[in-house]
């Protein structure tokens, strides 16, 4: 990339900065949830909605981001994304109630949904094709650093300042990023097709109301009748989308995608798999603080080995899949993650705290292997004309399943805790023990889906090579 013009390098820095903001925000909040609950006068059992409101909004808005960038221009949409994200951060810091915080997090989610996909699109437009891989490696590196710094930085700010600062630090950074975007980034546009607004609204309504219904009376305080109504609305919306997309060449996501068996299995496995693994980044710091009495900063530091294990495993995951095949790797890592989850709970409750960093490092390795294998399996056999649509659907499903996972984790805590989780409660560790046992079972269930994946090692070799050349 040394031969790129200075203006292009600055534009890549802006995109990298956006990736960092978005990735940092996905992890920095987790460590602060118990302190937020105390400050807002809420039960810690309700605080999972702070994460769900953000991730669910990202899932809902993702399908529209690429079309908006092509229609309005990448600079205008990227600038809007940074502004919305920064305003959402300000409103989060100013929130005096949980409901205000949830609305502000949803605003943040709108910005976050546009930031990363539009950033990728920007790189495609400003960098020559032969340098695309190097450019994407450069801009995504800060996105990998964000999860590494987020938990510890969040714990540090909570312990020595207040939880408000995990949002306030975004404001000066966001202002600088917005100004740099206006001054330095070109506003590329493309000829667009007619956006499938009907399909978008049906999917958005279906995803949102079903997630809210899942949270149920434990989180949102809804009556059984209201929950039943939400379920009915959500199911009807999704059925209407299926009818709408059938034989519709302009549908948001074509049903032709599901004619590819590996895509169907991979998407189903990714959805179910990320529900289980999506619980872990939320539950781990909460358990360390409320269940074991760790300080916010200590709990944040404990998350670093998990991120390091995940980053380190990415270098050899292709060789692992080539050697053993998708089916064996996915079944083994799914069951392995369930066992590591049980190991974490056991060592924590036994008081073997010095072992926890090693267990979390192992958890990161197993999870990373499974994620990479799921992603590649899902997309590897799609025809070229469906690859972009399949990738967008996978990205949406990833966010949706993580929001559902966090929702279920909060539901389990509420179910076993009966609203009595606190540091002084003698039943706290028992509540967490039952929750972690349930999580381990949920994490293991996708193994039944992955067991149906064809196990063709030679095919995996060819696909892995193609994957590496495309990155």
Curated annotation (Swiss-Prot):
The stretches that face the Cytoplasmic side, renumbered to this chain, are: 33-48, 98-101, 159-164, 218-224, 284-285, 363-395, 452-471
Could you tell me where this protein is found in the cell?
A: Cell inner membrane
**GO CC terms for this protein?**
plasma membrane
**TM region(s), chain numbering:** 12-32, 49-69, 77-97, 102-124, 138-158, 165-185, 197-217, 225-245, 263-283, 286-306, 342-362, 396-416, 431-451
Is Transmembrane set as a keyword in this record? yes
Q: Which UniProt keywords apply?
A: Cell inner membrane, Cell membrane, Membrane, Transmembrane, Transmembrane helix, Transport
Subcellular location, principal: membrane
Disulfide pairs here are none
The yes or no answer to whether the keyword Membrane is present is yes
The chain's Periplasmic topological domains, given as residue ranges, are 1-11, 70-76, 125-137, 186-196, 246-262, 307-341, 417-430
Q: How does the entry describe its membrane topology?
A: Multi-pass membrane protein
Gene3D superfamilies the record matches: MFS general substrate transporter like domains (1.20.1250.20), Multidrug resistance protein D (1.20.1720.10)
MF term (GO), any: transmembrane transporter activity
Its family? Belongs to the major facilitator superfamily. TCR/Tet family.
Q: Which PANTHER family match?
A: BLR6921 PROTEIN, MAJOR FACILITATOR SUPERFAMILY MULTIDRUG TRANSPORTER MFSC
Q: What is this protein called?
A: Putative multidrug resistance protein MdtD
Q: Which organism is it from?
A: Shigella boydii serotype 4 (strain Sb227)
What phylogenetic lineage does the species belong to?
Bacteria, Pseudomonadati, Pseudomonadota, Gammaproteobacteria, Enterobacterales
**Gene name as annotated:** mdtD
